[in-house]
Amino acid sequence: MDTESTYSGYSYYSSHSKKSHRQGERTRERHKSPRNKDGRGSEKSVTIQAPAGEPLLANDSARTGAEEVQDDNWGETTTAITGTSEHSISQEDIARISKDMEDSVGLDCKRYLGLTVASFLGLLVFLTPIAFILLPQILWREELKPCGAICEGLLISVSFKLLILLIGTWALFFRKQRADVPRVFVFRALLLVLIFLFVVSYWLFYGVRILDSRDQNYKDIVQYAVSLVDALLFIHYLAIVLLELRQLQPMFTLQVVRSTDGESRFYSLGHLSIQRAALVVLENYYKDFTIYNPNLLTASKFRAAKHMAGLKVYNVDGPSNNATGQSRAMIAAAARRRDSSHNELYYEEAEHERRVKKRRARLVVAVEEAFIHIQRLQAEEQQKSPGEVMDPREAAQAIFPSMARALQKYLRTTRQQHYHSMESILQHLAFCITNSMTPKAFLERYLSAGPTLQYDKDRWLSTQWRLISEEAVTNGLRDGIVFVLKCLDFSLVVNVKKIPFIVLSEEFIDPKSHKFVLRLQSETSV
């Protein structure tokens, strides 16, 4: 019978075989493969998550998956062990943490530097027309000609144009940053440079022709400020075209393939740089792709390792270092055993499907009974006073034990236990009770894997990405480009294809060609 060890303070289980005690100790040591928060294991370190997001079940991603069938009475053999080490760290973890800190510091500096430059330039743009109008009033007010009705109308026009420019600039440029990219946006940088040169040229002309000569025609000075504001508005229109409208027309089709399981999606994009296209791919990945589950890959790895471990090579000529000959012998033996391996795979998958269907049926029945109990409690609470009514959280805690065992076994069988903590299940159950959802609506999250956004962020296993491309990431997309988005456990391979040019011709059909004459004879029966 399988036994499990639970470390106090953390949800950590290790599976033991039903053989001798010594073999169980070896299995325990082998199964204590570390997992950090992002799901990456290391042979030299152990990283334990904080108990805030304690999973409902053990994180079996370090185990070899379905090597042994769990006994249904595992709950009666659970042993609590205390006094164990809670934290451990290796030199690899220290190096990785220091590298992440350096990268984060560099990204923060770059982000704040860009924001500072953009803010300074924006402040300069909005203060320049106001300074053009106020400086003559401050320096040579007595020498200026009086401002007539037309001049005052120009001042009102400048005020409203500056207000429109302020709102448009805030809406286009001062939006919350969605991601940190390795390079700057080329068009945005060009627009900032253009605005800077434009404002500097206006200041030079203003200093030479107006400040030095002390121009007395105040109307011309106001008209000069109006021309500056008009030019800034046109630059803002140009920014809208380059940054927003240019990318709306689809020009390329991107095929995104996940390297581990081959799941793929297709997206249509317009003229974008490689790094901006990567951002679009990642934003769609979190809502379109099912969450990455490394536990589903352990069964095939274990089967291949077991298949090769059963092969031994004997050298009848004596000891030698002929590694090439041994490798060839192993490959030949594996090829001879290949004929029977498909039967093993077939029966393993059939047995797994049988267990999944069995435990799914038990889970569905348990959840339906729990929701029937909730409906009965709600009918009873309608007759109680308002102070005695149970809230959805208390109702969820009341019925959860009746379905916990069936849900636990199903999640372990489908290897989803590390994505669902007990707290998240209770919150989802309380949400379903509050909105009067059916048992099927509650089970939909657990019966099939959903997109990444459906789960907590600490279960995503992919928060930091690296963009790998043979070309500069600021270059635009073109046909045949391949770039890779890599995280800790898997990567997304993106293949760019240009949408083909379609030739559509028109063929006119004369409406008279569809007409026909039905001639009836006297003998014809209609």
Swiss-Prot record:
A GO cellular-component term linked to this record: membrane
Keywords: Cell membrane, Membrane, Phosphoprotein, Transmembrane, Transmembrane helix
Any matching Pfam family: Strabismus
Intracellular or extracellular location(s): Cell membrane
Main location: membrane
Keyword Nucleotide-binding: no
Quaternary structure, from the entry: Heterodimer with Vangl2. Interacts through its C-terminal region with the N-terminal half of DVL1, DVL2 and DVL3. The PDZ domain of DVL1, DVL2 and DVL3 is required for the interaction.
Protein name from the UniProt record: Vang-like protein 1
Provenance organism: Mus musculus
